[in-house]
């Protein structure tokens, strides 16, 4: 059969406003006498890097020698010639007070001393040509239950939990955290530093490190995929060539 006539559409993303469409799904629909009828499956934006203010090239490691470290180990890293390193950034540690961040008309609060500690660590590394990878983790925090997938309970032998974007409140909070971190560590401020690589969750095939409780494999994978997409969109729409 012959294909239809090609068509293109333009619309504003309204980025940074309460009606932000950057994370929305879109469908093609036709107008019928009964209203609009969907004729395509929903699709998310797949190229958020096009709107990223930071279009700088990816910072590739200058060597394969790497180390996961803290600020107290910086001197050792320099002596060893380390050129890439990773840091853990956990939700339950970075939320608090002292830094207010507005996103889509809502204000979110981050711990000033904790964030400044990350600033010192990340900037010390990236300013010395060490490529930095951030590992994003979701620790249990009774003060922020919306960050945990509903139905998940705290376990003594579990270290971290699946990020929650399955509810509107969880989606909004997770999105704000992702956007804050992506903007904070985009390299524009040398006092904050530059994160070039992002790992969302840790050992996601291990229930102790990305716990969600009893569920099917397909539901677990879909939930992780949805959370990953939020971070991917936040990161790539800020720094186009981050990985």
Regions found by a protein language model. Name each.
Residues 1-53:
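Beta-strand-enriched, solvent-exposed domains that form extended recognition/catalytic surfaces
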Residues 3-7, 40-45, 58-64, 172-176, ...:
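Short linear motifs at secondary-structure transitions and domain/linker junctions
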Residues 8-12, 79, 234:
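Ser/Thr- (and often Asn-) enriched beta-sheet segments in non-cytosolic proteins
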Residues 9, 67, 130:
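Extra-cytoplasmic beta-strand recognition segments
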Residues 14, 36-90:
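Boundary/entry segment of secreted carbohydrate-active catalytic domains
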Residues 20-22, 61, 126, 192:
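Solvent-exposed loop and beta-edge segments used for protein-protein assembly and interaction
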Residues 80-243:
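Substrate-binding cleft and catalytic face of glycoside hydrolase catalytic domains
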């Amino acid at each position: 059969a012959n294909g239809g006539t090609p068509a293109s559409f333009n619309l504003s993303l309204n980025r940074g406003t309460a009606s932000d469409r950057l994370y929305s799904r879109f469908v093609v629909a036709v107008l019928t006498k009964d209203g609009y009828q969907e004729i395509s499956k929903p699709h998310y934006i797949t190229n958020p890097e096009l709107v990223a203010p930071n279009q700088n090239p990816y910072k590739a490691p200058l060597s394969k020698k790497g180390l996961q470290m803290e600020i107290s180990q910086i001197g050792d890293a320099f002596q060893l010639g380390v050129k890439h390193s990773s840091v853990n950034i956990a939700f339950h540690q970075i939320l608090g007070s002292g830094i207010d961040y507005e996103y889509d008309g809502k204000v979110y609060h981050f711990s000033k001393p904790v964030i400044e500690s990350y600033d010192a660590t990340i900037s010390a590394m990236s300013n010395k040509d060490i490529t930095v990878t951030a590992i994003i983790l979701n620790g249990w925090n009774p003060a922020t239950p919306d960050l945990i997938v509903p139905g998940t309970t705290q376990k003594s032998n579990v270290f971290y939990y699946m990020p929650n974007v399955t509810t509107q409140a969880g989606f909004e909070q997770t999105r704000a955290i992702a956007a804050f971190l992506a903007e904070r560590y985009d390299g524009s401020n040398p006092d904050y530093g530059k994160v070039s690589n992002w790992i969302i969750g840790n050992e996601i095939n291990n229930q102790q490190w990305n716990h969600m409780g009893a569920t099917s494999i397909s539901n677990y994978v879909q939930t992780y995929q949805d959370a990953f997409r939020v971070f991917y969109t936040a990161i790539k729409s800020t720094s186009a060539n981050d990985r």
